[in-house]
Amino acid sequence: MPSRRLGRTGWLLGVVFASASVWLAPGLPGPASAADPAFGTPTASAEYGKGVTFEQPFTPTSEVKRVEVLVTTPGTVGPFVSSVKAPSCCQPATLTFDLLDANEHLVPNTRFTAQWRVTDADGTVRLGEPTSVLYKDTRFDWKTVAGPVVRVHWYDGPTDFGKRALDIGEKGIDDAAKLLGVTETEPVDFYIYSDEKAFYDALGPGTRENVGGEAHADIRTMFALIKPDEIDATWVSTVVPHELTHLVFDTAVKNPYHFPPRWLNEGLAVYLSEGYTDSWRSAVEDAIRGDGIIPLDGLTAQFPTTRDQFFLAYGESVSAVDYLVRTFGRDALVKLVRSYADGVTDDEAFTAGIGHDVATFQAGWLHDLGATAPAAVGPRPGPVGPLPSGWSGAPDQPTATLPGPTAPGTPSSAPTLPSSGDQVGVGLLVVLAVVLVVLGVALVRRGRSTAKPGSGDQP
């Protein structure tokens, strides 16, 4: 299962819950004679389970209008910018910015880079030197073995365990790269956990409980839950290539505009790691018999969470890729996938690869399966409410009408003005009310002037 985070981690797309502060150093020398702000050497530190801290020694020599920190991670199009309280002139200060894991989960093996930007009152903008830190899972004493592309890290099991995992990983990368016509040169880190709790802690609280492996293409890292005695199990030789295929897929389609549908990514990973097996085929056929097939446009983003629907989504995905290869050939599949690197839409990619848009491809896939497209389910108009007596059917849409003169004999819904007699009666009532109010006020004032003073009052 890939973890595709647009622009790198949720906190870069939303609000960062982080602390930003300025520490003024007491007892240091007064204002510097230099005309420009003085940036000291920036530092960055990380503590697993807590977060990342950036510090920048800084001595302003004039009024500072704004201080910002620019944070980037692998895969981002641009930096995340956060304002930090500007120090007053002209004492040495240490600017501080924290990314807290308690507020937004930080994935291990992520490198955070920060650079400080200061804007003076006159509009002059100055940049400090960038600094970076790798956020690592330091709970274990990791062992490492490396191949041409893959670096395996594990803490439980002998050296043979790591080497076996390396062989599986290198083959998975090589097979996917050959199919998609890409060359992988950047290293891929493969972290193996033997403890379930530690594994899920590393991936974060949003991880589904049925996940045994997860690839993070932005940091070119794969995490897997494999115990030493499971390394030769059949599922290991399936899960590892599956997840690593996602990393190669990302290399083939990488662009800042549009990512391919989820079913194509997962379907290709299943197709390469195990194929359209009898078990997947059986799941799809059962869904067809029960009219429970999920259209491909319902599998473009997240897959269903219930167990049966979750596995059906994978079965349908590999079924669609299998149909694509059987009908149009592997070269068409590769052309389709590689076209995404240009940032095209799904229809444009499919048209470039197989000569048909997505809807036409889906119709052909369903026909090949002997299935019918399910009825679309989505927002529907609410039921009509109770109607007034004498009404029938849906009421007409009301139109706004300004009141105006009405022809003689024509009824009007506009309010009618009171007659002259009514106006006189209303006027008398108003006068009477005013007289009563005046009399009441006079009586209250007289009562106050004749009351005896209390014991504490002065005569």
Features from the language model and the residues they span:
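C-terminal membrane-anchoring or membrane-association module
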Residues: 426-459
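Juxtacatalytic substrate-recognition/specificity segment
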Residues: 141-261, 290, 303, 313, ...
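Extracellular Ser/Thr-rich, low-complexity/disordered mucin-like segments
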Residues: 405-435
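Bacterial N-terminal signal peptides
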Residues: 13-27
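Acidic/His/Gly-enriched intrinsically disordered linker/tail segments
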Residues: 209-222, 234-239, 244, 251-394, ...
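Beta-strand-enriched, solvent-exposed domains that form extended recognition/catalytic surfaces
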Residues: 30-139
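N-terminal secretory signal peptides that target proteins for export/translocation
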Residues: 1-8
